[in-house]
C-alpha cells in the first residue's frame, strides 16, 4: 500500500492561505498572486463572506474553513447562556456566509458542522466553536496528505499528468487535493511531467497552480485551455487529475468550468481521469448532477484580462464557473476514506452510505 511516509512535507507543504490569529482571520489574497503576496484581514463574518464571494479565498475546502472561522468571528458580539440560544442569534450571519458561493458543498457542510457544535454546547459554547473551526482545518490537512498518497498509488512511474484550476495548498488547509496527489507523485518519482491549464477567466491555473508548483521546485508546463485535447493526442498525458466542488450520489462531479470537456477528451484519447476531494465534498443527498446549482458570475469577467478590456462594447457573455462531469467519465474518485474506481450510485453508496 502506498503511504505518505516518504514525502518531504517541509518541501511540499508550506503554503497556507488561511491564518487565524486569535483576533481576526487573515486570508492570502489570491486575486493578486503571483506578483503580489498580500493578506486581507477579516474582523467580522460579513467581511469573510465578502472575501469568499470576491474570490479572495477560493477552492471548496478553503471556502468551508474560512466560513467556519467566519462563524467564530460572528460569535464575538453574541451574548447567550448556551450554544442553542447563540445559534438563534447567529443564524442570519450563517445564512449570509452560506450565500457567498452556492456550488461548493464544503461551505454548507462546514456551516452545518458549526451549527451542530452550537446546538450541543453549554455555557462554554464560544470556546467549543473556536475549537471546532480549528478541527475542521486540521482534519482537512490530514485528509489531503492521505489522499495524496492514495491517488499517487494509482499512477505508474514515468507518467504525465494534466490538472485544471487550482487544487493545491491555496485551495485547502494545506498540501492540496488534486495538486496533493501530484506533489506526492513527484516526491515518489511516479510523475515525470506536469501540465496545467490556464483556467479562464480567472486564470487560476496560470496564476496560482504553476506558481505553487514553482515554490516546491516542481517544473510544470502551462498550456492554453484549448490545447488540452491536442496535448492528450501526443501521448504526453496518462492522467487528468482534478478537484471537485460537489460530488453527487452517483459520482457526477461539479468542478471548475472546463473540467467536463477535459473528461470527454480524456475518454476519447484513453487517458485516465481522477477526481480528488475530501469526503466533505461528497453530497449523497444530491442524486445526480442535474440537481446542482451552477454559479453564474458577472459576464464582465470575460470581457478582458488583467483589467484591460479585449472585447468590443455591446457583446453578450455567458459565464458559468462550474460544470458537471458525469460519473461514467471518471476512472477514480479519491477521498480520505479510500478510492472509488469507476464510480456508480452503488459503489458510492457502499463507500459513503445514504
Swiss-Prot record:
Which reaction(s) does the protein catalyse, per the Swiss-Prot or TrEMBL entry?
5-(methylsulfanyl)-alpha-D-ribose 1-phosphate = 5-(methylsulfanyl)-D-ribulose 1-phosphate
Q: Where is this site: Transition state stabilizer?
A: 165
Q: Give the originating organism.
A: Stenotrophomonas maltophilia (strain R551-3)
Active-site annotation: 245 (proton donor)
UniProt function note: Catalyzes the interconversion of methylthioribose-1-phosphate (MTR-1-P) into methylthioribulose-1-phosphate (MTRu-1-P).
Q: Which family does it belong to?
A: Belongs to the eIF-2B alpha/beta/delta subunits family. MtnA subfamily.
- Cross-referenced SUPFAM superfamilies: NagB/RpiA/CoA transferase-like (SSF100950)
The pathway it acts in is: Amino-acid biosynthesis; L-methionine biosynthesis via salvage pathway; L-methionine from S-methyl-5-thio-alpha-D-ribose 1-phosphate: step 1/6
Q: What is its EC number?
A: 5.3.1.23
Say yes or no: keyword Amino-acid biosynthesis present: yes
Please give one Gene Ontology molecular function term for this protein: S-methyl-5-thioribose-1-phosphate isomerase activity
For this protein, the record's Pfam families field holds: IF-2B
For this UniProt record, the keywords arranged alphabetically read as follows: Amino-acid biosynthesis, Isomerase, Methionine biosynthesis
* Positions contributing to substrate binding: 58-60, 101, 204, 255-256
Q: Name one GO biological process term.
A: L-methionine salvage from methylthioadenosine
Protein name (database record): Methylthioribose-1-phosphate isomerase
Amino acid at each position: 500500500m502506498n503511504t505518505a511516509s516518504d514525502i518531504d512535507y517541509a518541501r511540499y507543504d508550506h503554503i497556507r492561505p488561511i491564518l487565524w490569529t486569535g483576533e481576526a482571520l487573515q486570508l492570502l489574497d489570491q486575486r493578486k498572486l503571483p506578483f503580489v503576496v498580500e493578506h486581507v484581514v477579516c474582523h467580522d463574518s460579513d467581511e469573510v463572506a465578502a472575501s469568499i464571494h470576491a474570490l479572495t479565498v477560493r477552492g471548496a475546502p478553503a471556502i468551508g474553513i474560512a466560513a467556519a472561522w467566519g462563524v467564530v468571528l460572528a460569535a464575538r458580539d453574541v451574548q447567550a447562556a448556551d450554544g442553542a440560544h447563540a445559534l438563534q442569534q447567529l443564524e442570519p450571519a450563517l445564512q449570509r456566509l452560506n450565500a457567498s458561493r452556492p456550488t461548493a458543498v464544503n461551505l454548507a457542510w462546514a456551516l452545518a458542522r458549526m451549527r451542530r457544535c452550537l446546538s450541543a454546547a453549554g455555557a462554554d459554547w464560544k470556546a467549543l466553536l473556536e475549537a471546532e473551526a480549528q478541527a475542521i482545518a486540521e482534519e482537512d490537512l490530514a485528509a489531503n496528505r492521505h489522499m495524496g498518497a492514495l491517488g499517487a498509488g494509482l499512477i505508474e512511474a514515468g507518467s504525465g499528468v494534466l490538472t485544471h484550476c487550482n487544487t493545491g495548498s491555496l485551495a485547502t488547509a494545506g498540501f492540496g487535493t488534486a495538486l496533493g496527489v501530484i506533489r506526492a507523485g513527484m516526491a515518489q518519482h511516479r510523475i515525470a511531467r506536469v501540465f496545467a491549464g490556464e483556467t479562464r477567466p480567472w486564470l487560476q491555473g496560470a496564476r496560482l497552480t504553476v506558481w505553487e508548483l514553482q515554490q516546491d521546485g516542481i517544473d510544470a508546463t502551462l498550456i492554453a485551455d484549448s490545447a488540452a485535447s491536442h496535448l492528450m493526442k501526443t501521448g504526453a498525458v496518462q492522467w487528468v487529475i482534478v478537484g471537485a466542488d460537489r460530488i453527487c450520489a452517483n459520482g457526477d462531479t461539479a468542478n471548475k468550468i472546463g473540467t467536463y470537456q477535459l473528461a470527454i477528451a480524456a475518454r476519447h484519447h484513453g487517458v485516465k481521469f481522477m477526481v480528488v476531494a475530501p469526503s466533505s465534498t461528497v453530497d449523497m443527498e444530491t442524486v445526480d448532477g442535474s440537481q446542482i446549482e451552477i454559479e453564474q458570475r458577472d459576464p464582465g469577467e470575460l470581457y478582458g484580462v488583467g483589467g484591460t478590456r479585449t472585447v468590443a462594447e455591446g457583446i453578450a457573455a455567458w459565464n458559468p464557473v462550474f460544470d458537471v462531469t458525469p460519473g461514467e467519465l471518471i476512472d477514480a474518485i479519491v477521498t480520505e476514506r479510500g478510492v472509488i474506481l469507476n464510480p456508480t450510485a452503488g459503489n458510492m453508496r457502499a463507500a459513503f452510505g445514504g
